Swiss-Prot record:
Family, similarity comment: Belongs to the universal ribosomal protein uL5 family.
Protein name: Large ribosomal subunit protein uL5
GO MF annotations in UniProt: rRNA binding; structural constituent of ribosome; tRNA binding
PANTHER family per record: 60S RIBOSOMAL PROTEIN L11-RELATED
Subunit relationships: Part of the 50S ribosomal subunit; part of the 5S rRNA/L5/L18/L25 subcomplex. Contacts the 5S rRNA and the P site tRNA. Forms a bridge to the 30S subunit in the 70S ribosome.
Lineage: Bacteria, Pseudomonadati, Spirochaetota, Spirochaetia, Brachyspirales
Taxonomic superkingdom: Bacteria
Function noted in UniProt: This is one of the proteins that bind and probably mediate the attachment of the 5S RNA into the large ribosomal subunit, where it forms part of the central protuberance. In the 70S ribosome it contacts protein S13 of the 30S subunit (bridge B1b), connecting the 2 subunits; this bridge is implicated in subunit movement. Contacts the P site tRNA; the 5S rRNA and some of its associated proteins might help stabilize positioning of ribosome-bound tRNAs.
SUPFAM superfamilies (UniProt xref): RL5-like
NCBIfam families in the cross-refs: PRK00010.1 (NF000585)
Organism of provenance: Brachyspira hyodysenteriae (strain ATCC 49526 / WA1)
Pfam annotation, one family: Ribosomal_L5_C
Entry's Gene Ontology BP terms: translation
Family matches, as PROSITE patterns: RIBOSOMAL_L5
């Protein structure tokens, strides 16, 4: 069992139950899944970019990535329906906690001038989106062997009813949010 999952089961659940005044342990918010998406714009002109993106995303996630294809044709982008345009992977269970652990303790501290992740990434339903500009912050990716620096989007889906519950959960798990601006502290 990963350290993060063990900490969630033994410490975080109990503190959330007390702090949120929940009546049942089933109402405690938890992380349901993590979706990692990598869009590859160069895939329109060269198919090898998608193959390298799939390989690198599979190394980062520890699970085989799936190629995503265009739903519609867009002439201005020289895009045809069904063309590969990126890849994604959905993590659940043990692999999800392992990835989250590596993200929090290894990858995010390697970001240049890191001051925390933005607080505005919540969608209103208790889910959090985080964009990463360089996939090379993960230790699985060698900067010398990659053909181009790619960005990726990480979506953390929780069972929380609202953004405040989700923010509390993710802060307790250990996601390093930026300090709240002075105007938000009074709210």
């Amino acid at each position: 069992m990963s350290v993060l999952k063990d900490r969630y089961e033994n410490e975080i659940k109990q503190s959330l139950l007390k702090d949120m005044n929940l009546s049942s342990t089933m109402a405690i918010p938890k992380i349901e899944k993590i979706i990692i998406n990598m869009g590859v714009t160069q895939a329109v002109t060269d198919k090898k970019y998608v193959d390298s993106a799939v390989e690198e995303l599979s190394q980062i996630a520890g699970q085989r990535a799936v190629v995503t294809r265009a739903k519609k044709s867009i002439a201005n982008f020289k895009l045809r329906q069904g063309m590969p345009i990126g890849c994604r992977v959905t993590l659940r269970g043990e692999r999800m906690y392992d990835f989250l652990e590596r993200l929090i303790f290894i990858a995010l501290p390697r970001v240049r001038d890191f001051q925390g992740i933005p607080r505005r990434g919540f969608d209103g339903n208790g889910n959090y989106n985080l964009g990463i500009k360089e996939h090379t912050i993960f230790p699985e990716i060698s900067f010398d062997k990659t053909d181009a620096v790619k960005g990726l989007n990480i979506t953390i889906v929780t069972t929380a009813d609202n953004d405040d519950m989700a923010r509390t959960l993710l802060e307790r798990v250990g996601l390093p949010f930026r300090a709240a601006p002075k105007s938000q502290e009074n709210k």
